[in-house]
């Protein structure tokens, strides 16, 4: 689940062959305004590829729990981690991401995290079929909000 961005929508189209369910939210009012006024970006955007009902955090969490993989599609210029990365760690879900900087983190494991190119996303069958490799609790705990606050207060 993610907010509509042109790059995210295009990535969803490129990933259709893998038959993933990728939810992209868009405000229905602005969608129709952009379609009526024929914004170029919306020329090929189909209503059926979007979700117009917002989900609360509980619904999003429920969807993530029932998923085998989570998609982390970062903004083009983003370098840091998104909430989706932490969700995948806590829920022990495999992560498919466009963020190549994730390799530098101690929790990175190519068995659990697949880095894709947004222009030509290729997802190996082996990645999809292999089991999630548990990350040590010690590593996960250091990314908990309580730990971040503790580190800030110590500085």
Locations of regions flagged by a protein language model:
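Pol beta-like nucleotidyltransferase catalytic core
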Residues: 14-15, 47-48, 70, 90, ...
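Nucleotide-sugar donor-binding catalytic core of glycosyltransferases
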Residues: 1-78, 82, 98-102, 145-155
